[in-house]
């Protein structure tokens, strides 16, 4: 049995360890958007070049001024960024952070009824860690277990605020599709259970087509009802709601974006054909590792591509992946972003983007767009974020080196003009936490020593025990004796 006091101290220490970011939550409360002037920085605006020794004035959470010389207002908090670089906040177009529990509702092939926004977890430590990597916005997706998965949500990484404050206000909602090995469950089965349809790529296509045929008919039923009501027909009876089809109708109406997990060229072209058949647009192809083979078709469809920088050969679908994928699609006119699909990968998306300069020869500006403006365009939020322009949200990252350098380390991350990560404060809090841990350990040590000394007259451990061998001790009448000498 565990010593209760030791267990208590262990819990305290463990809690302190995992609570470290609690000390480094937003420096400014949500209702106190400060006036901040960042000055003497190299500003990489993404949209209109680089400003050397530049300044950014932030008011009410927005970028108020950007230029070479801005006078600080009297009430401004001045950040001297001499020798440092400022870029727009990094946007991860494929993320699974901040989710409470599994990201997959894999019991059915079409799970459009479920919504990731309902299970956001504001205490997920990956929010803080990704802030430390410069990420300010994430497209949080359902998993890829279904041909048509759950509804998605775009969030801002407002660490320290409740779940209701995470969603990006005004962002177009999305829905996750998946093609290939994952939805047909090539490497997954439940013992004793009937395999779930579909089990082939053909089945995946027909699952999507059938769902949209139903959604189209469902939409027509509602359109007819609305026309009758508008014409004054009081006998019109409202159709029955279908929560599974409602999100698909929103796709048909352009009110919800499709983000499709895919790898191979054949399935990419298949989905583009189905989308054309039903009159909707695929907003982004996610992963899209063979996108370079059909880049012209992707560009012609007006579809974006969100891919990895250099992940390949980790499963059969990724066999033909190449690190030149992002650059080739960019050259062919596709709006491309680099995503993480992994909480740790998201902490260095700036360096993932930099790899495209080596593999494909993208320029510095083109590479930086892959994790800033381009994903903003893909998510339909480029009027608010993605570049450093007057009027946009003050979502900014300050680096100690060029952000595409392997030596770049985030110094501060701002969202809506508030500092949500500060490296100096983080380091100071680590030192304070270490002191607290040592103090608790010392307190426990003294308590144990005091307990060992005992009170005057107390018997020490082992005192007062019966003498003699076990076999000499009294035993109940008629009890059998068993010698354990040979055991």
Regions found by a protein language model. Give the residues of each.
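Histidine-rich, glycine-flanked metal-binding segment
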Residues: 28-29, 43, 47-87
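Polyanionic/metal-chelating signatures
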Residues: 131-286, 409, 415, 426, ...
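Bacterial N-terminal signal peptides
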Residues: 10-21
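C-terminal cap of metal-dependent C-N hydrolases
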Residues: 41, 390-432
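Divalent metal-coordination and catalytic microenvironments
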Residues: 41, 56, 61, 83, ...
């Amino acid at each position: 049995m565990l010593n209760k006091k030791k267990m208590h101290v262990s819990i305290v220490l463990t809690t302190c360890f995992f609570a470290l970011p609690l000390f480094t939550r937003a420096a400014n409360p949500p209702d106190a958007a400060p006036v901040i002037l960042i000055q003497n920085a190299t500003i990489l605006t993404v949209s209109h070049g680089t400003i050397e020794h530049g300044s950014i004035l932030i008011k009410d959470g927005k970028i108020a001024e950007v230029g070479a010389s801005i006078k600080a207002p009297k009430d401004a908090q001045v950040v001297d960024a001499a020798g440092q670089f400022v870029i727009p906040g990094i946007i991860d177009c494929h993320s699974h952070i901040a989710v409470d529990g599994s990201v997959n509702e894999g019991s059915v092939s079409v799970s459009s009824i479920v919504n990731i926004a309902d299970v956001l977890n504001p205490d997920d430590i990956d929010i803080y860690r990704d802030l430390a990597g410069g990420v300010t916005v994430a497209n949080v997706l359902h998993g890829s277990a279904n041909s048509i998965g759950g509804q998605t949500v775009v969030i801002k990484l407002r660490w320290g605020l409740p779940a209701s404050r995470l969603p990006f206000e005004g962002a177009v909602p999305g829905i996750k599709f998946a093609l290939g090995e994952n939805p047909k469950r090539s490497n997954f089965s439940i013992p004793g259970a009937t395999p779930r349809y579909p089990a082939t790529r053909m089945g995946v296509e027909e699952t999507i087509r059938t769902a949209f045929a139903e959604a189209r008919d469902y939409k027509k039923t509602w359109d007819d009802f609305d026309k009758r009501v508008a014409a004054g027909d009081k006998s019109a009876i409202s159709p029955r709601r279908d929560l599974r089809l409602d999100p698909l109708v929103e796709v048909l109406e352009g009110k919800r974006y499709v983000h499709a997990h895919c790898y191979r060229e054949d399935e990419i072209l298949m989905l583009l054909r189905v989308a054309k058949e039903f009159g909707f647009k695929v907003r982004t192809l996610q992963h899209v590792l063979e996108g370079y083979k059909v880049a012209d078709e992707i560009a012609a469809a007006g579809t974006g591509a969100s891919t990895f920088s250099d992940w390949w050969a980790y499963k059969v679908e990724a066999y033909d992946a190449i690190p030149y994928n992002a650059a080739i699609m960019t050259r062919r006119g596709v709006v491309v972003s680099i995503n993480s699909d992994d909480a740790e990968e998201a902490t260095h998306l700036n360096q993932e983007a930099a790899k495209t300069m080596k593999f494909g020869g993208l320029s510095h500006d083109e590479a930086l767009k892959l994790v800033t403006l381009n994903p903003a365009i893909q998510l339909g939020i480029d009027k608010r974020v993605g570049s450093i322009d007057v009027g946009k949200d003050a979502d900014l990252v300050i680096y100690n080196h060029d952000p595409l350098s392997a030596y770049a380390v985030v110094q501060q991350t701002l969202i809506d003009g508030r500092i949500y990560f500060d490296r100096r404060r983080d380091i100071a809090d680590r030192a304070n936490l270490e002191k607290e841990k040592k103090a608790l350990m010392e307190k426990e040590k003294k308590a144990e020593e005091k307990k060992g000394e005992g009170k005057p007259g107390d018997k020490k451990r082992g005192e007062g025990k019966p003498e003699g061998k076990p076999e000499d001790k009294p035993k109940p009448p008629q009890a059998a004796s068993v010698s354990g000498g040979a055991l």
